[in-house]
C-alpha cells in the first residue's frame, strides 16, 4: 500500500526543467537586463556626456532632460543591444565553454532574444531620430559596427586589431560625436579629440583579453595578448593610451586651452604607477588597472570636453 506522498507524486504532472518553466514579467525583465550587461554601459554613457559638454551648448534648462535621454540611449539601450547581439552570436561557442550562460543554459530563449533585440532597436532608433539626424547617423553606424564585431561573415572579434577598433570607435568616438551633435553642430576640434580617445580606448579594450588568453587561443581568436604575448600586449595597452593622451594635451595647448591641457597632463602622469604595475603582471593587476589608470583616463576625457566648451 503506497503512502500519500507516493500518490501525490503519481497524480501530479511532471515538473518542467527550470529553463522550460513559464517566466513572469519580472523574471523576463531581470533576464533581459542581465543579458544587456549593465557593467558595460558606463563607457558610451560617459562619452556621450563628454561630447555634449564639448558642444558648449549644454545648459541647466531643458537640455538636461535631453542629455539624460541621450545618455540612456547610448548606455542601457544601444550598448545593451550590442551585448545581446554578441551573446546571441556566441551561443554555440558558449554552449561548449560556458554552458551556464543565459542563452546556452536555456534561461533565455531565442524568442526572448529576438523580442528584446527588436524592442531595443526600436527604442534606440526612436530616441536617435528625436535627437537629430546626425545623432541617428552615428547610431546607425554604431549598430553596423556592432553587427560587424559579432556576426559572420566579418565577425571582427576574431582579430584583436579589428574587433577592438570597432568597439573603441563605437563606445568612445561615435558616442562622443553623437553627444555633441545632439546639442550643436560638430566641430573639427571635437571630432579630433573623440577620435584620439577612441585610439586610447583600443588599448583599454585589450585589458579585458588577458583573462581569456587560453580560451581565445583554443578558439582561434587572435586577441592582442594571443598575438604578442602578455608583456608586449600590456606595453601596447599603456603606449596606446599614453600616445592618445599626449596628442590631446598638445592639441589643447595649441587651441588655447592651457588649463584643460594641464589637467589632462597631470592625470596622465598619475597613470605611471598603475601602468608599471600592469606591465609587470597584467593578468593579476587587471582590476587595479581598471580602477586607477583607466579611471584617470576617463576623467581626462571630461577635462578635455570642458576645455573645448570654454
From Swiss-Prot:
It is found in: Cell membrane. Keywords: Bacteriochlorophyll biosynthesis, Cell membrane, Chlorophyll biosynthesis, Membrane, Photosynthesis, Transmembrane, Transmembrane helix. InterPro entries: Chl_synth, Prenyltransferase_related, UbiA_prenyltransferase, UbiA_sf. One of its GO terms (molecular function) is transferase activity, transferring alkyl or aryl (other than methyl) groups. Residues 1-20 are annotated as: Disordered. Pathway: Porphyrin-containing compound metabolism; bacteriochlorophyll biosynthesis (light-independent). This is Bacteriochlorophyll synthase 34 kDa chain. It comes from Chloroflexus aurantiacus (strain ATCC 29366 / DSM 635 / J-10-fl). The gene is bchG.
Amino acid at each position: 500500500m503506497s503512502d500519500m506522498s507516493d500518490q501525490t507524486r503519481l497524480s501530479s504532472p511532471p515538473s518542467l526543467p527550470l529553463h522550460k518553466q513559464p517566466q513572469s514579467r519580472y523574471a523576463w525583465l531581470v533576464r533581459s537586463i542581465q543579458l544587456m550587461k549593465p557593467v558595460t554601459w558606463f563607457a558610451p554613457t560617459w562619452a556621450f556626456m563628454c561630447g555634449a559638454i564639448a558642444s558648449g551648448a549644454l545648459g541647466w534648462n531643458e537640455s538636461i532632460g535631453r542629455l539624460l535621454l541621450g545618455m540612456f540611449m547610448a548606455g542601457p539601450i544601444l550598448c545593451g543591444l550590442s551585448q545581446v547581439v554578441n551573446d546571441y552570436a556566441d551561443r554555440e561557442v558558449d554552449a561548449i565553454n560556458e554552458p551556464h550562460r543565459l542563452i546556452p543554459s536555456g534561461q533565455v530563449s531565442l524568442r526572448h532574444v529576438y523580442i528584446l533585440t527588436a524592442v531595443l532597436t526600436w527604442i534606440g532608433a526612436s530616441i536617435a531620430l528625436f535627437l537629430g539626424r546626425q545623432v541617428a547617423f552615428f547610431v546607425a553606424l554604431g549598430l553596423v559596427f556592432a553587427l560587424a564585431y559579432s556576426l559572420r561573415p566579418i565577425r571582427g572579434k576574431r582579430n584583436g586589431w579589428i574587433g577592438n577598433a570597432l568597439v573603441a570607435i563605437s563606445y568612445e568616438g561615435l558616442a562622443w560625436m553623437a553627444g555633441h551633435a545632439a546639442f550643436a553642430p560638430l566641430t573639427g576640434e571635437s571630432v579630433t579629440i573623440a577620435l584620439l580617445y577612441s585610439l586610447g580606448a583600443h588599448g583599454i579594450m585589450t585589458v579585458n583579453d588577458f583573462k581569456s588568453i587560453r580560451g581565445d587561443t583554443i578558439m582561434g581568436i587572435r586577441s592582442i595578448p594571443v598575438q604578442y604575448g602578455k608583456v608586449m600586449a600590456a606595453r601596447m595597452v599603456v603606449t596606446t593610451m599614453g600616445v592618445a593622451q599626449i596628442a590631446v594635451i598638445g592639441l589643447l595647448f595649441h587651441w588655447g586651452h592651457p588649463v584643460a591641457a594641464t589637467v589632462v597632463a597631470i592625470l596622465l602622469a598619475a597613470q605611471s604607477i598603475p601602468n608599471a604595475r600592469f606591465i609587470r603582471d597584467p593578468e593579476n593587476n587587471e582590476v587595479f588597472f581598471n580602477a586607477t589608470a583607466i579611471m584617470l583616463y576617463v576623467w581626462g576625457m571630461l577635462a578635455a570636453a570642458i576645455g573645448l566648451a570654454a
